[in-house]
Amino acid sequence: MNKVSFLTLGCKVNQYETEAMQELFKKRGYEICNENDICDVYVINTCTVTNLSDRKSRQFISRAKKLNKDAILAVVGCYSQVAPDEISAIEDVDVIIGTKNRARIVELCEESKKSNLKFNIVSELTKDCGFDVLSIENQESKTRAYIKIQEGCNMFCTYCIIPYARGPIKSRPIDDIYEEAVKLANNGYKEVIITGIHVGSYGLDLGNDTRLIDVIEKLSTIENLDRIRLSSIEAGIISKDFLIRLKNCKKVCEHFHLSLQSGCDKILKLMNRRYTTDMYRKKVRMIKEIFPNVALTTDIIVGFPGENDEDFQETLNFVKEIGFSKIHVFKYSKRKGTPAFDFKEQVDGNVKKFRSNELILLAKDMTTEFLKKELSEKHEVLFEENINGNRLVGYTRNYIRFSAPYNEDMKNKVVYCNGISVEGEEIFGLASKIKI
């Protein structure tokens, strides 16, 4: 039996696409192995969000061929898309695929092995490319599964290379999304997480009225699916109508990852984020009015070019006002090929580090406060992971990591639980009743 291993860099979308490519290899009889095993094929699914990501991609490309000099080495993904010539210059690479045509990966790897030829099928991404369908029936996690519903982004934030790596928005047909979700539910998955590059733009390219909310409403009709969770969305999609329709879909989780990036209007404008803090504030109020028990998580970039101490303080103040349950903090990293790369007033590295540490400390305090507030609530927990044989860990509907004493009967079940204590960034508690 031929063996293949995958190494994946980057986001949840990349992880989804890796698992989809793994299924393609499995269907051709390949054994999926560890990245450090001796294999016949190595696939590096690359990331290009920062220059560091590019460097890591090159390092892993170099390492893979050293494991087996006779293996086929395929490099796919975002770095391949934006820098195919750089990858072509690496002698050991046999197959180069960008962010489309990944369904051909098995065919190209086998043809390369047979003919001793190299293949580079990276081509320009246009709005006419269509959605590159990669679907999954089984994922590594047996409780929660990702479903990719769209590709690409038209927003062009000044710090972001992704619109160039992923191309214009391309929406997956709604019936295809539904069919994949049905298969996942039939295979025992209790929760699906809707993901994509810019999820809120779903449907804008279809030439009809189908939008993200229509996808959610259709998935909510799947009888043996208990939960639907949204990945990252933007403030612009939030409206009263959208939220009311979400609320009526009883399976939608009370958790919104609402990307912020900065709490300073000056910086938001420099980033080309297309909203103000006042608009964001109003959207949050709408959410909390309709989903009182909601968890709000976000991303923030510190040290963006032009950000001074007063601007950063505005971000700190705004973060406190909103009351996030969790914040992912990133230090701005220059990315060649983006407008911000050439911006003046680049922030010193030590200043970025200081601001990052300060925001991380604030974020930890906010997470603790949120968890303490949630201790008195009764939670539905989908248990999925066994920790050291004595605890099960899972997530509540509002995305709190929750642990309880191990009980085999609760694994991959939704269980009503009561919290006892806050332990770091999770709640420990006891089960009261299995829901499903």
Regions found by a protein language model. Give the residues of each.
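Short flexible coil/turn linkers enriched for glycine and charged/polar residues
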Residues: 140-143, 153-155, 252, 262, ...
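Short, hinge-like loop/turn segments at secondary-structure boundaries
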Residues: 91-93, 112-115, 210-212, 246-247, ...
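Conserved SAM/AdoMet-binding glycine-rich loop
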Residues: 73-74, 82-83, 87, 186-309, ...
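Hydrophobic, well-ordered secondary-structure elements that form the walls
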Residues: 258, 299, 319, 327, ...
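Short, solvent-exposed loop/turn segments at secondary-structure boundaries
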Residues: 53-55, 168-175, 203-209, 270-273, ...
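Terminal RNA-binding accessory module
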Residues: 342-436
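Short glycine-rich, low-complexity segments
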Residues: 325, 338-342
